[in-house]
From Swiss-Prot:
Residue intervals of every C2H2-type zinc finger in the record: 26-50
Protein name: KIN17-like protein
UniProt entry tagged with the keyword Nucleus: yes
SUPFAM superfamilies for the chain: beta-beta-alpha zinc fingers
Biological source species: Schizosaccharomyces pombe (strain 972 / ATCC 24843)
Length: 304
């Protein structure tokens, strides 16, 4: 039976049937041809083309198997590098991605019989990082290209430099915040100190008799000198003796300044109390209403 011509309904139907992956047991690796059922595979193995191809492979089977193995390994690593890079992925999941290609090299044509054996081979050769856990094998590609290695090292160095610069900026920012906080605290302390009342000393002039008492309000800078002069003047009274009389007369007797100050304060307090009593407190609205009601009651009583 001849083969259907291209574009005919029979050819289109066969193409739709052969689209996608088929059973691996019905795939001929020697001829690289996929059959759709067991009968088709049996007919293919009895065909003249298949027998001729098997005779060619039988001349040097090891070389043919090695070629298939190298091609399988090359395609597998290329897809891993381009699709996932150096990311870690489950080995069986990635193998399913690899066999999606209809024209891929099947593993039954290579020297590896199982996926576990092939995964261990990749780890021993240093082509991939292989990790095994309770979920199975995980692989990740190892990039050995010198240019890529230099680029990765430069990227890591730049990341470390950026990290150190960021840490330095954060440290400087913390120091600035600390200095600003300390300066603010010092300013508040200075304001509190300046707002406090300074102690005032009363400097009394008792040098001349008969003159009114003079009080000088000095600042805290002259406190010690003014205080010493005051007590020296108070504690050392001066006396004069008359030659004509036998009695000693007191020429200069210091006055009790504090007693006079107390008297003046009492007098001022008394005057302020008298003035406060004389000033009438304004009445409230309730008091006005009560007064009006009282006046009305008085008028009613008078009329009666």
């Amino acid at each position: 039976m001849g083969r259907a011509e291209a574009g005919t309904p029979k050819a289109i139907s066969n193409a739709l049937k052969s689209k996608g992956l088929q059973r691996l047991r019905w795939y001929c690796s020697a001829c690289q041809k996929q059959m759709r059922d067991e009968n088709g595979f049996k007919c293919h193995t009895q065909s003249e083309g298949h027998i001729r191809q098997m005779n060619v492979i039988a001349m040097n089977p090891g070389k043919r198997i090695q070629d298939f193995s190298n091609q399988f390994l090359r395609d597998f690593i290329s897809l891993l590098r381009t699709a996932h890079g150096e990311k870690k992925i489950h080995f069986n999941q990635f193998y399913q991605e690899y066999i999606r290609d209809k024209n891929h090299v099947h593993m039954n044509a290579t020297r590896w019989h199982t996926l576990s054996e092939f995964c261990k081979f990749l780890g021993r050769q240093g082509m991939c990082r292989v990790e095994e856990n309770e979920k199975g094998f995980f692989i990740s590609y190892i990039d050995k290209n010198p240019a890529n290695i230099l680029r990765n090292e430069a990227n890591k160095k730049r990341e470390r430099q950026e990290k150190s610069d960021e840490e330095q900026r954060l440290r400087l920012l913390d120091e600035q915040i600390k200095r600003a906080y300390e300066s603010a605290q010092n300013n508040e302390d200075n304001k509190d100190g300046s707002s406090r009342e300074q102690p005032v000393l009363h400097e009394i002039d008792l040098s001349k008799k008969g003159n009114p008492i003079q009080l000088n309000l000095s600042s805290s800078s002259d406190s010690h000198s003014a205080q010493n002069e005051f007590f020296q003047t108070r504690n050392t009274p001066t006396f004069s003796f008359s030659s004509s009389s036998s009695q000693t007369s007191l020429k200069h007797k210091p006055k009790n300044v504090f007693a006079e100050l107390n008297k003046s304060r009492k007098k001022n307090n008394k005057d302020s109390l008298d003035q406060g009593q004389n000033v009438k407190r304004p009445r409230s609205a309730v008091e006005d209403i009560i007064a009006q009601e009282t006046m009305r009651e008085k008028r009613r009583n008078i009329k009666l």
